[in-house]
Amino acid sequence: MRILLSNDDGYFAPGLNILAQHLAKVADIVVVAPERDRSGASNSLTLDRPLSVHRANNGFYYVNGTPTDCVHLAVTGLLDELPDMVISGINDGANMGDDTIYSGTVAAATEGFLLGVPSFAVSMSRHGVQHFETAAKFMVSLVKRYQKDRFPPPVLLNINVPDVPFDQIKGTEVTRLGKRHKAEPVIKSTTPRGQTVYWIGAAGSAQDAGDGTDFHAVSQNRISITPLQIDLTQYSQREQVKNWLAL
């Protein structure tokens, strides 16, 4: 099995390197990741300039583009063989609920999915991670399971892992996305030269975090696994919109 690894934290990120070390024991891996931190890049593609690809001393490819660029480039032109799987991560911080809209980690997996490759995004439940090994060990077990019994395509799974030692994990749970409160306001400040600048505010706290959500699962030290889809259609409102337009 050949696995394409990517992320949004950059090719040098500890989570990606630990994941690569573990998965190399059970599969052939190739890493194509951004040259710098591209957290929050979502599904953006670079269309206004060419992309450059370089190879680090450890064999990882790094690209001056977004996470989506990396996977798109790898699958459609860079690699001699198509990967059997795309794994994005391990992200330093959660990608739960509304996070999935902004996440470059999830976006990299989504691009693999759109290109017909079974894809997985894996993130830790908080920033400042201490236990990347926990997620890496779980992903090894998931890959082994997939090698033995392949899940029918299409596959796009968003995985969030509690930041605890592996022996404290209380199993897995198939979940739905929760929801956060709206983000904190932007932070306004002034540079030493008197220029006004703004920082994007922090993500909101969990709002919908009840039973069955990704937020609830990780709070109970369970690994959250949420199947995702691309279709954003709000089916329940189609008739309502038709009636509104007919007025």
Curated annotation (Swiss-Prot):
GO molecular-function terms, A-Z: 3'-nucleotidase activity; 5'-nucleotidase activity; exopolyphosphatase activity; metal ion binding; nucleotide binding
Function per UniProt: Nucleotidase that shows phosphatase activity on nucleoside 5'-monophosphates.
Record-listed E.C. numbers: 3.1.3.5
Keyword Cell membrane: no
Pfam families attached to this UniProt entry: SurE
Binding of a divalent metal cation, residues: D8, D9, S39, N91
Domain of life: Bacteria
Family, similarity comment: Belongs to the SurE nucleotidase family.
Cofactor note: Binds 1 divalent metal cation per subunit.
GO cellular component: cytoplasm
Reported cofactor(s): a divalent metal cation
Top-level EC class: hydrolase
Chemical reaction(s) catalysed: a ribonucleoside 5'-phosphate + H2O = a ribonucleoside + phosphate
Annotated keywords: Cytoplasm, Hydrolase, Metal-binding, Nucleotide-binding
InterPro entries, per database record: SurE, SurE-like_Pase/nucleotidase, SurE-like_sf
N-terminal signal peptide: none
Subcellular location: Cytoplasm
UniProt name for this protein: 5'-nucleotidase SurE
SUPFAM superfamilies: SurE-like (SSF64167)
